[in-house]
Amino acid sequence: MKNKWKRILIGILCVIFATIIAILVHALMPGPGTEVIEDDFDSKLVLALGFPVVASLYFVVLYLQMWGFMGILARKSKLSGPEIGFRFGISFAAIYIVGMQEVILSSSPFTEYGKDFFLYQLSMGLGDGIPVVLLCLALSALCFPKENIKKTGGLRITRDAIVYMLCVSCGFFTQRIIGYIFGYIDSDFKSYPLETILWALTMGATFGIANILISPVFCGNVAKQRMLSLLIISINWIWFNLFIGLIYEGLFLSMLLRGLCDFTGMLIGLFIVQRKGTEL
């Protein structure tokens, strides 16, 4: 019981430090246009609490999820703590960095897509990604049993893993393109079709790779591993998207829908893999 509370305290402290680092990194690595974007934050939450408080709470929840995923679901993993931390950290950092590049000018300080947009979004992605890598490595070093330290799973890129990755990637990509065409997902697809399609392809590939990296962390059969991996990635992705809904009035439901549709698309891809009976 004493060790349990010690792990909880360490986890909370790690989340707090990661949040502080995220705020500092965002402050130290501003992209072009950062001086004007805060003027547009008009949600009731921002008006009531202020943007710094809302942003801090967002990061706390984002990183608390990581602590829960690693500390609860991955605690009985056959892999070593450092390997778990590496897999989680790299996967979610990549999701944040690539996710920030989505071509949505309305949620940025820019009126056209170009170099400044790319650099600004890159700085925002790094501001989220660097702290999550440090957090996952710290949690794996401080909160996992020392007896697991010698166990390692390595990284196996098999044919079945590639099929799994491709199905998840295609599920995301297909859902996004359908959403852009029919308009239930807000985007700048009509103005920047090529850039939007390339981003959707890259984001889909990122989700696919993240899933094959994280799924072996969990215990159980392949189907359970894959479902857990997809669930935690989707939950975190939904919250990641909701940041825009937290700071801009009237966008919360549309951002929630965006994340849920992405999850649905990837879930369909997972079902296709399971139907074929492939295994990692």
Describe each model-derived feature in a short phrase.
Residues 1-280:
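Juxtamembrane/disordered regions of integral membrane proteins
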